[in-house]
Amino acid sequence: MMRTLEVRRHTMRRKPGQRPAQDGIKLARLVRDESGHFDPVVSSDVPRAIETTIAIGYEVREIDPMLGHLPDDVFDAGVWPASFDKVERAVASEGPISRFADEQSRIWTGIVQKIPDGGKALVVTHGLFVEAGAIASLPEADHGSWGGAIGYCEGVRLTFDGAFEICQILHVPYGRHLVAN
């Protein structure tokens, strides 16, 4: 039986702070209205991800620091923000981004394996985490067709039946796409 994992990027914040901006809270509520029920709900340990989860309307059941830890060598590679095909090329290089992507996919697999057949889990994480994890989860997919960088509250919906099988790119309503603020 299929299981579903939805992985979303956090909402926009009021920089330089970590707290979501009012527009970010509104955007998270739009996601809530289209998402349905999730169990479990997992977040990175970064406050903006936790607060996005709450703004979407869910209690954070589990916090995984690795969903928010970007290794220095991955950050220094300067890959993000970037389209899925650019991230795919970085993942294919078998360097730090490849290892990072594989780690995200392993975390996601561990989460989806915990849910019952027919269940859905939500992960709230960060830019590049979404793109890299999705690419590593479905390495044979046509990543170029997946589009540009994931914006705030956007993400992927992956189906799982022993392995990840299908990836649907999740967008916010037209006119609300924003990668950086």
Indicate residue ranges for each PLM-predicted region:
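Internal catalytic-core helix/loop-beta-alpha segment
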Residues: 86-118
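Acidic, low-complexity terminal tails and accessory targeting/binding regions
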Residues: 2, 69-79, 117, 135-181
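Histidine-centered active-site/metal-ligand motif
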Residues: 10, 126, 174-177
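Beta-strand elements within well-structured catalytic alpha/beta cores of enzymes
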Residues: 3-8, 42, 115-129
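Active-site-proximal alpha-helix that buttresses catalytic centers in soluble enzyme cores
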Residues: 1-64, 70-71, 78, 87-97, ...
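Short amphipathic alpha-helical segments
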Residues: 53-55, 134-137
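Conserved glycosyltransferase catalytic-site signature
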Residues: 46, 50, 105, 127
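Short active-site segment of divalent metal-dependent hydrolases/proteases
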Residues: 13, 129-130
